[in-house]
């Protein structure tokens, strides 16, 4: 049985490991003795049905204070990773597909007809190739028709942008997408209700606004705290990434947190600022295998997460993380003066 001292030590260790863990996480509130907050997290859908050897030492306490209401069909694996690929890039079929099949990994491919999709088949997939990805068991997600950023000015066009991709999927025998990725990782509060009405269960954003967009850094998805239509990316791969950057993103998985990873082309000639070298991508996937990660598509989160249980304030966890990270950065700057 963990003492309070042991509980505090293990919780701090978990925060140090991931580097960006939220102070408002269910585990932290349990450690602080804030049982009311723990119950709120559980009601929102936090999965505490974790293996009994959970290193945070908080599982028993969570269950004691209302965790007997299981919110998902299956226990969450210790290292749960979601792979996502944006923009219908040709290399998704020619390079990514065989690598994922070799490792037997799941993944979501978010398709759009934006950019030069209709005329440039050197850099973008055909719908026949997208259909083949579906036939292989991968998820086809919605990334809007024109890769339209979701802003105040474009909200009115969002239903048709999403419905167009849904119709195209239907025409090629692909199920209507239930997962969505925000083009350009641009989010807007009023999009949540709209996405729900369009049948979207899970929506992935980037690592911003917690982190700047430029370096692709992000945070893990915390079910019950993060809204299922505002799922953050733990990492958004960039051409200057190293294996260490990828490992840092993956290491955030655990203790009830999920590492959702964002890729574009492998390679990506039309968007070189989000390009991933194939050789490095191969190393990334090997690392996931060596770490014995459970690697799934975004839709398959429904096996572990109840998408109908929502936090009271969708953006509260985002603001909390921003405040914590800002404080940490200020402390670092003060120590270097």
Listing of model-derived features with the role each one plays in the protein:
Residues 9-18:
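Bacterial N-terminal signal peptides
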Residues 22-28, 42, 51-58:
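Ankyrin-repeat boundary/"N-cap" motif
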Residues 34-43:
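Ankyrin repeat structural motif
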Residues 58-65:
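Leucine-rich solenoid repeat scaffolds
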Residues 67-70, 117, 170-172, 202-214, ...:
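C-terminal domain-boundary segment and adjacent tail
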Residues 80-81, 101-201, 207-232, 256-268, ...:
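Metal-dependent polysaccharide deacetylase catalytic core of the NodB/CE4 family, i.e.
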């Amino acid at each position: 049985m963990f003492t309070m001292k042991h509980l505090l030590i293990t919780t701090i260790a978990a925060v140090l490991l991931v580097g960006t863990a939220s102070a408002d996480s269910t585990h932290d509130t349990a450690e602080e003795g804030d049982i009311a907050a723990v119950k709120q997290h559980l009601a929102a859908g936090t999965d505490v049905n974790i293996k009994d050897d959970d290193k945070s030492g908080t599982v028993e306490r969570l269950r004691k204070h209302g965790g007997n209401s299981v919110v998902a069909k299956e226990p969450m694996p210790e290292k749960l990773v979601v792979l996502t690929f944006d923009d219908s890039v040709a290399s998704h079929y020619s390079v990514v597909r065989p690598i994922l099949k070799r490792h037997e990994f799941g993944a979501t491919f978010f398709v759009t007809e934006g950019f030069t999709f209709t005329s440039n088949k050197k850099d973008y997939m055909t719908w026949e190739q997208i259909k083949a990805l579906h036939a292989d068991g991968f998820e086809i997600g919605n990334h809007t028709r024109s890769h339209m950023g979701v802003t105040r000015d474009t909200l009115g066009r969002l239903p048709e942008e999403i419905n167009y991709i849904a119709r195209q999927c239907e025409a090629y025998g692909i199920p209507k997408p239930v997962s969505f990725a925000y083009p350009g990782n641009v989010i807007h509060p009023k999009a949540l209700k709209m996405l729900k009405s369009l049948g979207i269960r899970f929506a992935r954003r980037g690592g911003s606004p917690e982190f700047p967009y430029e370096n692709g850094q992000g945070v893990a998805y915390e079910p019950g705290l993060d809204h299922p239509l505002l799922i953050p990316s733990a990492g958004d791969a960039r051409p200057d990434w190293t294996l260490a950057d990828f490992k840092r993103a993956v290491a955030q998985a655990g203790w009830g947190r999920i590492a959702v990873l964002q890729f574009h082309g492998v390679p990506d000639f039309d968007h070189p600022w989000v390009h991933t070298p194939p050789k490095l991508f191969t190393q990334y996937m090997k690392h996931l295998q060596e770490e014995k990660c459970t690697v799934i598509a975004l839709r398959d989160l429904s096996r572990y997460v109840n998408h109908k249980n929502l936090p009271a304030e969708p953006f509260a966890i985002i603001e909390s993380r921003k405040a914590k990270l800002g404080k940490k950065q200020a402390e670092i700057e003060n120590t270097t003066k």
